[in-house]
A protein has these predicted regions:
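A glycine-rich beta-to-alpha transition motif near the start of alpha/beta enzyme domains, typified by
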Residues: 1-115
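ATP-dependent small-molecule kinase catalytic core of the GHMP/sugar-kinase superfamily
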Residues: 90, 99-142
């Protein structure tokens, strides 16, 4: 059994797991694992899988789509990941950095007394030039 937590941000839901869990359980193929656990009929069901790794002693978020493909980033996912990090006392500060495939992201968080959690992430300027978009599937972009 793999320990995980499930979070939701603006209607997108994510399974979040620490990579240590996957290593301890002998799960080497994260793409296959993502497809299995994200399956809404036979798995837990989610839009994606977020895996916490550590790089240079900093939290690193790896994102997998529900079909098992890896993507460089997910906007709603990073906010849910920030909530997971705070809930699990991985960082103490309200402002912290998380590494993702495209680079480091600074996240500002706030926990309200009523329980609402807020995360603000500057993901940089949007890219509209299709020649500069990361295309991990190597498909032709129109």
């Amino acid at each position: 059994m793999v320990k995980f937590e499930k979070y939701q941000g603006l209607g997108n839901d994510f399974i979040i797991v620490n990579e240590k869990e996957l290593i301890e359980k002998g799960i080497p193929d994260y793409n296959e694992f993502a497809a299995l656990v994200c399956d809404r009929h036979f798995g837990v069901g989610a839009d994606g899988l977020l895996i916490l790794k550590y790089v240079a002693n900093m939290p690193f978020m790896f994102y997998y789509n529900s079909d098992g493909s890896q993507a460089p980033m997910c906007g709603n996912g990073i906010r849910c990941f920030a909530h997971y990090i705070k809930n699990n006392n991985i960082v103490e500060e309200d402002t912290f950095v998380v590494k993702v495939v495209p680079g480091d992201l600074t996240i500002e968080t706030h926990q309200e007394e009523e329980g609402d959690f807020w995360a603000k992430v500057n993901m940089g300027k949007p890219i509209f030039n299709v020649n500069k978009i990361i295309n991990s599937n190597k498909e032709e972009l129109i």
